[in-house]
Amino acid sequence: LMGIIMPEEPAGPVVKAADGAARITTFKTLTKDGHNPTLVPAITAGTLFTGVFSINISSTLKSTKFGLPYNKKPSKFSFTYKYTPGSPVYQSVEKDGRNHAVLVDDKDLDQCSIAAYLFEVSSYDETLDGTNVNTSSKVILKAELTDGTAKSDYQEVTVDFKETGNGSYDATKKYKLAIVCTSSKWGDQFMGADLSSLYVKYLAVE
């Protein structure tokens, strides 16, 4: 991949771990000379999600098409996970036509994010993506992990869906549900730590 150095283990951003969990990993992806062409971020957060991945060369964050059709009002989001954050935290910054990994001074450790979103659509062809899933007025319900810090042992968590203030559920309307799990919660800003690893064993919405 354009001379980018990738660690041998783990082998990719989302792989099956030895215990059967999904291992989701952030990479500092740089060429041998320490910077990348502008189309290749210097920091890439691993993301496991419901939806479709379709490469968008002009906007990497729009490659993740979040959401699947969902026909009822969700109440709870349950998951089992553990997390090993990397350090230090870097951000991919463009300079002189290249992307560089720049140290983020005010963040010592990375954090993960696990969240579920119910959003309204006029057509099931509509999706949200990495640029707008956390800001879109279409999202009416959201359930999320509140503590994205290190967890050495698996945690069983159940969180409630809460209204976002963008309207209430209406059974006559169309909705899609997006579950998004990432090893770097600031990944939509191309920010994270090399080899931060989120392990997810179980996901359920009820």
Task: Say what each PLM segment does.
Residues 1-78, 95-98, 107-206:
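Aromatic (Trp/Tyr/Phe) and Gly/Pro-enriched flexible surface segments
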Residues 81-105:
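Short amphipathic, basic-aromatic surface patches that mediate peripheral association
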